UniProtKB/Swiss-Prot annotation:
Residues 676-688 have a biased composition (Low complexity). Residues 25-107 form a propeptide. Residues 1-24 form the signal peptide. This is Furin. Residues 160-182, 673-697, 766-793 are annotated as: Disordered. GO terms for cellular component: cell surface; early endosome; endoplasmic reticulum lumen; endosome membrane; extracellular region; Golgi lumen; Golgi membrane; membrane. Inhibited by the not secondly cleaved propeptide. Inhibited by m-guanidinomethyl-phenylacetyl-Arg-Val-Arg-(amidomethyl)-benzamidine (m-guanidinomethyl-Phac-RVR-Amb) and 4-guanidinomethyl-phenylacetyl-Arg-Tle-Arg-4-amidinobenzylamide (MI-1148). Inhibited by Decanoyl-Arg-Val-Lys-Arg-chloromethylketone (decanoyl-RVKR-CMK). Inhibited by heparin/heparan sulfate-binding. Belongs to the peptidase S8 family. Furin subfamily. It comes from Mus musculus. Residues 121-435 form the Peptidase S8 domain.
Amino acid sequence: MELRSWLLWVVAAAGAVVLLAADAQGQKIFTNTWAVHIPGGPAVADRVAQKHGFHNLGQIFGDYYHFWHRAVTKRSLSPHRPRHSRLQREPQVKWLEQQVAKRRAKRDVYQEPTDPKFPQQWYLSGVTQRDLNVKEAWAQGFTGHGIVVSILDDGIEKNHPDLAGNYDPGASFDVNDQDPDPQPRYTQMNDNRHGTRCAGEVAAVANNGVCGVGVAYNARIGGVRMLDGEVTDAVEARSLGLNPNHIHIYSASWGPEDDGKTVDGPARLAEEAFFRGVSQGRGGLGSIFVWASGNGGREHDSCNCDGYTNSIYTLSISSATQFGNVPWYSEACSSTLATTYSSGNQNEKQIVTTDLRQKCTESHTGTSASAPLAAGIIALTLEANKNLTWRDMQHLVVQTSKPAHLNADDWATNGVGRKVSHSYGYGLLDAGAMVALAQNWTTVAPQRKCIVEILVEPKDIGKRLEVRKAVTACLGEPNHITRLEHVQARLTLSYNRRGDLAIHLISPMGTRSTLLAARPHDYSADGFNDWAFMTTHSWDEDPAGEWVLEIENTSEANNYGTLTKFTLVLYGTAPEGLSTPPESSGCKTLTSSQACVVCEEGYSLHQKSCVQHCPPGFIPQVLDTHYSTENDVEIIRASVCTPCHASCATCQGPAPTDCLSCPSHASLDPVEQTCSRQSQSSRESRPQQQPPALRPEVEMEPRLQAGLASHLPEVLAGLSCLIIVLIFGIVFLFLHRCSGFSFRGVKVYTMDRGLISYKGLPPEAWQEECPSDSEEDEGRGERTAFIKDQSAL
């Protein structure tokens, strides 16, 4: 028996050697597949294939089909004449050919970059597998060619020798000074180096003898100068909406203050820019917004209190150190999707990239450095498949990210078997895996949104509140969901010390997401007003079943507050057939995969098919649509079913002022045609009135406390001002008394009689200096005024 196995092995090896030799000599190698021309449609082709033992692999195009036979050798030096002849005699077969294996080589020759600092880019080419597997994506031939990335920041040095070759003016603008030039403003401290550093991570030119290389070193790179001046809602919106059909990826490494007490996010215009980007950008495929998760770790901040990283429209990226640990600056939250490398402790390496004044740096740090690395990997992935939507990209990240080599105490396995962490999301991005999966990716079904009103009456939070609700995920409705993507818990609550709250959401499949951890520096009594806490931890789970919201007071203090509204918002998909699709016909142009890209007149494109009437929540619009041919991407003007604005249920246009009807939680303004949320007072259930004699005293105390709490900030502010004025007056009188000052003006106060010592500073002689007008103007030029505080991460 052993001899027989050995002989079989020898024969197989010899056959392989013969095939390799034949291949090298240019001889034909026949496969076990045939191309067959059979008019009459797929059913006729299936019958012919089945009759002769073939399997129909599908339509090549028109009446040409791809047949495969299990019994035929996969690779042979001679054709299989018997099978070929029997199939040829079939009257329905007009032509056939046994397929021959052809040698094809990618014309991108991969060579390791020769840039001087490339060996120091450990996160691209690690020898211990602690890297982002970027070299594997390069080896597959993907370097970012044809992809455009814009850095939304303080400008980029467009003439930097490692950026100039890839600079794209169409992806650049100076919103601060209203001109097309994003060149940063130079200062002594090089304050505006942030954008240039981020740009180099994405697309620093390769093999030019300067610095290192970008992740997508053949991508086009631009920058928007928008942080070096007044940052307003309009400034953010203009930046986020710049050239959305030219720019593929926007990378942002900034956000509200990471001080552990701020709750802030995009205002109306920026939120609209996000929505327009994902619904209309890239010809309807959706702009991709990559966001740094935040640097507030030392302040115990939560990135779920940052409305930019907490948005479903952004791909939020966290950081890991060289040794796979959570950095000291990292924020943990349930909205983070994945991680790339960045800086850590003093003994760990940092990020190599371009720097101001045409220099290089080896010390780029923070989540600022993580987001551009992710943007570069996403650029490689888009080159592999330019038809990916913004949601496709998030699915690819979830499916390919790697938890290995990352250390954290909170790794958990969700309901579909994936490991997920509040510090790392689904793990490290893997560039090689992403481009490999992207090449044959099937576009995900259109996004569905199911809104479930959970709370029907206000509930006292006390020490701990638990709200349970069984949901069907909109079963029986067109927006029924069976596979989750993002989940939002929209909460309105009051609490006398917001930072003591911890909030958790448990899915029907048992995944526990921390929506909010305690924030010791948050003393606010403002609570949350319809704040959308988002989690990605239940991705691909079935949302049907019991959801549990837990709110707890993490301190020993006798805090108090009320949960007045809880809306669960589910985003996801369902298999085709679970809801009735709109009528479909009228396709004018099909791709090779039988997806419709252009419809006949009177039809609109929806879910890869053509419909006469767009479904509720969509409107027909003529847009530029992109689709890939064999060698290029074509742009075609076509009528497409475009989603209504997020605030509308149905609409007559994409703007928030085009609403025809509203979701259940909002009301329609018939004049403005906008949907506005009901005021908090109208949402609160009024308690039933009791006769005064029957009201126990314990009911009066919470109301009194709540009343005091509502005015507490104003009272404290007034007392503080009064105390400051009194102290200032006492010190003023004391100093003038000591210096012999007379209110009649007989003596003049001078400082040469003594010293003034400030706490925390060494005593030194104080001299009052009045700056000249020129000095004052120069100083004003060096200062930056922010209407809306932003911090570079």
